[in-house]
Amino acid sequence: MGSKSPEGHRQTPDASNSSELKPANPNPKPARNGSQSADLDGGNLDDDNDDDGEANEEAGVKTSADSTDKKKKRKRSKKKTKKGTLPLKQSSPPRVLVSSLFPSGYPIGECVPYQDDNTSRTTDEELRYNSRLWDKDFLDEYRQAAEIHRQVRQYAQNELIKPGASLTTIAEGIEDGVRALSGHQGLEPGDGFKAGMGFPTGLCLNNVAAHWTPNPGAKDVFLDKSDVLKVDFGVHVNGRIVDSAFTVAFDHTYDNLLTAVKEATNTGIMHAGIDARVSEIGAAIQEVMESYEVEIAGKTHPVKAIRNITGHDILRYNIHGGKQVPFIKNDRPDKMEEGEVFAIETFGSTGRGVLHDDVGLCLSNVFSKANAPQVGVYGYGRNTDVSGANLRLSSAKNLLKTIDANFGSLVFCRRYLERLGVEKYHLGMRHLIDNGIVEYYEPLVDVKGSYTAQFEHTILLHNGGKEVISRGDDY
């Protein structure tokens, strides 16, 4: 989920959370990418060892009768084991808990060494100290969230995202999958804090680059074979948010646009690391992305890196932390630090490369005195720095209680409120926004007729390398 630049509509980082981000094992195991290819990793090792043991035992058998008896016993034992074994394959639609698919631990993301790593920068004593800080729960939660993201997006790519599909159906299919695989439906107060959606599913078409989701009261939109669709959704487990996005185009006309943005994102990942300057990362990303061009209807369009939306760090329960990672040349002094989590994302456009809030999509009368439904607003986020103690409007007080009990600082949308059974909340929401208690996100668009693309991954900055936690076989 892109962070709007300049500063605006960002969740205020909770400084107390940042200390919880601990560096991981400096020597991680090799990466296991993808979802289906990794599904069987958690359950097959014991069966193989049993077969080997049985083969050795069989080699010492002296009579055929004994051999027959032992084979029968082995067969009965094997059947009993199979009967009690949990499913080792995901269903379609995805409904099998990932915790049951990976009882021995979740797949590690793609592990990438830092560029030009100075091994003398960290002493042996520091390495021993850092290894003691390794937070296994932190890693397990992040890897579980990443596996949920991989499996749900694979289902979306294979079954949901097709010409003629309703964007509401796609969004709800993704979100139902995330909730089912995490084991938390989020319908009871506090349940949404345990696991579930990190933010609403973004489904942005063509010149709409970011922050659009289908909402109640709006006319449903159907996917056309000529569309370029950005799919951006987050999964969290215990507040550890995995933020990852991809773009789908059915027409090969846009292949270069998608390739440019995907390569730009991978360039950002390659340059990211401990002590890396965001200014240098942005310059490298822009150079790669703007080396591409796209021919549309006989006219050549250079791919432009979008200037006023950025990547960002991620804090616990806060999708946008205090650091931004632009994907253009810049003079920001910020550096990445060990133990931090970043969403490395890039957006490319065939248009101007500058986004603006679309009042047409958001409705110009959203905040009029008529208090019309906010049909086009993407989502809302609780500003945890502002108290609601002085609220006088009862509808605003009740709505704030619902927000605090179910979402906290996680971004939510109107669909999520209505899923909880909340009604007649528009006046209360308006009051919360006017008092700075809730912030809102509008759709961000480039010029009409242009096309935009997005790719994004979440990375963890370990001591000995970065883990691209959301990497899969697809991107």
From Swiss-Prot:
The UniProt record lists the keyword Transmembrane: no
Family: Belongs to the peptidase M24A family. Methionine aminopeptidase eukaryotic type 2 subfamily.
GO cellular component, one term: cytoplasm
Role noted for this protein: Cotranslationally removes the N-terminal methionine from nascent proteins. The N-terminal methionine is often cleaved when the second residue in the primary sequence is small and uncharged (Met-Ala-, Cys, Gly, Pro, Ser, Thr, or Val).
GO function term, MF aspect, one: metal ion binding
Catalytic activity: Release of N-terminal amino acids, preferentially methionine, from peptides and arylamides
Protein name: Methionine aminopeptidase 2-1
Composition-biased stretches (Basic residues): 70-83
GO annotation terms (biological process): proteolysis
InterPro entries: Creatinase/aminopeptidase-like, Met_Aminopeptidase_Type2, Pept_M24, Pept_M24_MAP, Pept_M24A_MAP2, Pept_M24A_MAP2_BS, WH-like_DNA-bd_sf, WH_DNA-bd_sf
Cofactor annotation remark: Binds 2 divalent metal cations per subunit. Has a high-affinity and a low affinity metal-binding site. The true nature of the physiological cofactor is under debate. The enzyme is active with cobalt, zinc, manganese or divalent iron ions. Most likely, methionine aminopeptidases function as mononuclear Fe(2+)-metalloproteases under physiological conditions, and the catalytically relevant metal-binding site has been assigned to the histidine-containing high-affinity site.
Provenance organism: Aspergillus niger (strain ATCC MYA-4892 / CBS 513.88 / FGSC A1513)
Residues that, per the record, bind a divalent metal cation 2: 243, 312, 345, 456
Organism phylogeny: Eukaryota, Fungi, Dikarya, Ascomycota, Pezizomycotina
Annotated Basic and acidic residues bias: 1-12
Cofactor(s) needed by this chain: Co(2+); Zn(2+); Mn(2+); Fe(2+)
Region of interest called Disordered, as start-end residue ranges on this chain: 1-97
Main location: cytoplasm
Residue numbers binding substrate: 211, 320
Subcellular localization: Cytoplasm
Top EC class for this record: hydrolase
Biased composition (Acidic residues): 44-57
Origin: domain of life: Eukaryota
Residues annotated for a divalent metal cation 1 binding in this entry: 232, 243, 456
Coiled-coil portions: none
Keywords: Aminopeptidase, Cytoplasm, Hydrolase, Metal-binding, Protease
E.C. no: 3.4.11.18
Family annotation (HAMAP family): MetAP_2_euk
